A protein has these predicted regions:
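Domain-length accessory/inserted modules outside core catalytic folds
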Residues: 1-116, 120-259
């Protein structure tokens, strides 16, 4: 698919198509993660600034920026707005852009790690952006404080970012469906192999790896929504300060926070 202004990628494959349109081999998962990380870090930009952000994340040369700047503004600006709406919505419908299940577990886990790396990079870029506000006082006023829950969620995403597919055996009992984000660190080791050498998995191992992968994606979803709710939903933080009564009348606090 060749993307034109007015179209917004809705999943991994469509974002991959857009990247091909702008002659980029960059990871769709990492780009989506970077946008979500920036939003979760309280970054709110114009379409043109989202284009600059996305093209910078992609490491696009100046020629790409000149040729595709308007298209990037349309596509990445609308993508950021749509994803912000999804994160704010209390339907908990947020999903990271990752490959379909017909891709190998190795490719999907690699994309999962790329998504988390993108998120962490985007989140860090948002913090740097806030510090460039006209004054330190304004920057401090615009920045919520990190809760322990947010710090631990970011730490877990950092661990997932380093994950590689386990090639031999894949424990499935390390994940607790009732686990709070503030509990002991996520057992990412279930994806790790001592030497990282790939070989053909037995059927049971493949099924275990698949189950573990899906569980970690669900944890990733909840961790991301927790970070956004407790830190990145800057609009609600400001409204809490200015009009608690108006806030209480809203239905909008997303319930993605883990307690």
């Amino acid at each position: 698919m060749n993307y034109s202004a007015g179209l917004t990628p809705q999943n991994f494959d469509e974002l991959a198509d857009w990247l091909l349109t702008v002659s980029s081999q960059f990871s769709p998962a990492e780009l989506h993660g970077a946008i979500i990380g920036a939003l979760s870090g309280t970054m709110r930009l114009s379409d043109e600034k989202w284009a600059q952000f996305g093209l910078a994340v992609m490491g696009a040369p100046i020629e790409t920026m000149q040729q595709f700047g308007d298209l990037a503004a349309s596509v990445l600006g609308s993508l950021a707005r749509e994803q912000l709406a999804v994160l704010i919505d209390d339907d908990l419908a947020f999903q990271p852009f990752l490959p379909d299940d017909d891709e190998t577990i190795e490719d999907r886990t690699d994309a999962l790690s790329q998504w988390c790396r993108g998120f962490l990079g985007g989140f860090a870029e948002a913090q740097a952006y806030l510090q460039k506000q006209p004054s330190q006082e304004q920057a401090a006023a615009n920045t919520p404080s990190f809760s322990e829950t947010v710090q631990e969620a970011i730490s877990d995403l950092s661990a997932i970012a380093q994950a590689v597919v386990e090639d031999e055996g894949c424990p499935v009992d390390d994940y607790d469906d009732d686990r709070d984000i503030g509990d002991a660190p996520l057992a990412i080791e279930s994806f790790l192999n001592e030497d990282g050498e790939a070989f053909e998995q037995e059927a049971g191992d493949a099924q275990a790896a698949e189950k573990n992968y899906m569980e970690i994606i669900e944890y990733l979803r909840l961790a991301t929504m927790t970070i956004f709710t407790e830190y990145g939903w800057i609009e609600i933080h400001h409204q809490q300060e200015s009009s608690p009564a108006a806030l209480s009348a809203q239905s909008g606090n997303p319930n993605g926070t883990l307690h």
